[in-house]
From Swiss-Prot:
Protein's gene: MMACHC
Family classification: Belongs to the MMACHC family.
Chemical reaction(s) catalysed: 2 cob(II)alamin-[cyanocobalamin reductase] + 2 hydrogen cyanide + NADP(+) = 2 cyanocob(III)alamin + 2 apo-[cyanocobalamin reductase] + NADPH + H(+); apo-[alkylcobalamin reductase] + an R-cob(III)alamin + glutathione = cob(I)alamin-[alkylcobalamin reductase] + an S-substituted glutathione + H(+); apo-[alkylcobalamin reductase] + methylcob(III)alamin + glutathione = S-methyl glutathione + cob(I)alamin-[alkylcobalamin reductase] + H(+); apo-[alkylcobalamin reductase] + adenosylcob(III)alamin + glutathione = S-adenosylglutathione + cob(I)alamin-[alkylcobalamin reductase] + H(+)
Protein's organism: Bos taurus (Bovine)
Entry protein name: Cyanocobalamin reductase / alkylcobalamin dealkylase
Role: Cobalamin (vitamin B12) cytosolic chaperone that catalyzes the reductive decyanation of cyanocob(III)alamin (cyanocobalamin, CNCbl) to yield cob(II)alamin and cyanide, using FAD or FMN as cofactors and NADPH as cosubstrate. Cyanocobalamin constitutes the inactive form of vitamin B12 introduced from the diet, and is converted into the active cofactors methylcobalamin (MeCbl) involved in methionine biosynthesis, and 5'-deoxyadenosylcobalamin (AdoCbl) involved in the TCA cycle.
Assigned GO CC terms: cytoplasm; cytosol
């Protein structure tokens, strides 16, 4: 790795890693090479970028402390706000650089994603992006099959949070890092893609490899709740709002305590199709 890249990576890691994030460098050219022009990042090919993902530890190391602080005004989505806060700290830690942060959920006015997060994760070597084209003679006929990223250490128990673009910082000699192909057989790839596309609510696709760490039951309950109901789940409704279900009456102290998750929490029924990307 080039000395400049190693130095910047270390600075970003010092800012993010204590809070359950990982960072991976890549060149914009590697990303653009895999996509049609409409999805290209409008930067010179050698521009340095970093892929940022969250590990299972982020929930305890970043989100809970964030909720205990005074950063939540006004309330929208606690996880997105927490991630935005920490990515903003990256910009503050490197004031001499031109830094642009693109979150995984950002879109252009025409609703086209600003970043295809799974492609970025693949070219950065963070996680292998398994797609239908990776299965020889696939069995799905005319069915639409979405792809999914698998991390070599966390399986599917992680989330891609965004990219950090360093405008004006070019690293033409940065060598590419291939992602680890941790689901190498045809049968296992078929199983992975079917679990993700048809049974994604049961979490099993995330165990495509034996993970070092999984989401806690507390995290699973949070991420299984519709976004519109998550504030109520955390006890963060405005005083004038009323919870619409018993599961929404749980106070934030439940989330912030070290006690086991309340077993009465409900679960969503499976929906027809998986999310566009394998979050959260």
């Amino acid at each position: 790795m080039e000395p400049l890249v190693a130095e910047l990576k270390q600075k970003i890691e010092d800012t993010l890693c204590p809070f359950g994030f990982e960072v991976y460098p890549f060149q914009v050219a590697w990303y653009n090479a895999l996509l049609p022009p409409a999805f290209h990042l409008p930067l010179p090919g050698p521009t340095l970028a970093f892929l940022v993902l969250s590990t299972p530890a982020m929930f305890d190391q970043a989100l809970k402390p964030f909720l205990q602080s005074h950063h939540l005004q006004p309330l929208t989505d606690p996880v997105d706000q927490c991630v935005a806060y920490h990515l903003g700290r990256v910009r503050e830690s490197l004031p001499e650089l031109q830094i642009e942060v693109i979150a995984d959920y950002e879109v252009h006015p025409n609703r086209r994603p600003k970043i295809l997060a799974q492609t970025a994760a693949h070219v950065a070597g963070a996680a292998y992006y398994y797609q239908r084209q990776d299965v020889e003679s696939d069995p799905w006929g005319t069915q639409h099959i979405a792809g999914v990223c698998i991390h070599p250490r966390f399986g599917g128990w992680f989330a891609i949070r965004g990219v950090v673009l360093l405008r004006g910082t070019e690293v033409p000699n940065l060598p590419p890092t291939k992602p680890v192909d941790c689901v190498p057989t045809r049968a296992d790839r078929i199983s992975l893609l079917e679990r993700f596309n048809f049974h994604w609510r049961d979490w099993t696709y995330r165990d495509a490899v034996t993970p070092q760490e999984r989401y806690s039951e507390e995290q699973k309950a949070y991420f299984s709740t519709p976004p519109a109901q998550r504030l109520a789940l955390l006890g963060l409704l405005q005083p004038s709002e009323e919870p619409s279900s018993p599961s929404q009456e749980l106070h934030i102290t439940t989330l912030l305590s070290k006690k086991p998750q309340n077993p009465r929490r409900g679960w969503l029924s499976p929906t027809v199709s998986p999310p566009i990307s394998p979050g959260p």
